[in-house]
Amino acid sequence: MAVDNNKAKQAYDNQTGVNEQERKEQQQAQNNQPQFENKLTFSDEVVEKIAGIAAREVKGILDMKGGFTDSFTNAFSNGNNVTTGVSVEVGEKQAAVDLKVILEYGESAPKIFRKVTDLVKEQVKYITGLEVVEVNMQVDDVMTKKEWQQKNEKDNKENNEREGLK
């Protein structure tokens, strides 16, 4: 009976092209070949830009506020740097985001924080595939929309005057 089973198996293998020994040899040959590894990486600046754009989309965020180097950089640019007020740490699969913001007076900081956190995580994950494991938001100032607009107009006027001097 065992002989019949072997004949049946051999007939099946012949019909389907399955050969156990051949399969093992192919697998061993594949294991001996050098394996190529594909890798997709993102610079910190890319993740900063994504997080900055996402945070600015949330109602109640008037602006992002940078430190001294951002202020210095904005003095020599048009001031539309979307990475201002954003810093990140990017690993191979995860990222952490720190934001410095100016909130609109009368808006709920905890609600805005939840919305910003959700949107930043969603956008970074969608665009890069990176999991955002931490979002920290520091409120550096609170302004009314009118105060913020006046400050922006003043800053734009100063930038335009500086541009005229170049």
Swiss-Prot record:
Protein name listed in UniProt: Alkaline shock protein 23
Composition bias type Low complexity, residue spans: 27-38
Family: Belongs to the asp23 family.
Classification via Pfam families: Asp23
Function: May play a key role in alkaline pH tolerance.
Renumbered residue ranges of the record's region Disordered: 1-40, 144-166
PANTHER family listed in its UniProt record: ALKALINE SHOCK PROTEIN 23, HYPOTHETICAL CYTOSOLIC PROTEIN-RELATED
Classification of source organism: Bacteria, Bacillati, Bacillota, Bacilli, Bacillales
InterPro entries the UniProt entry points to: Asp23 (IPR005531)
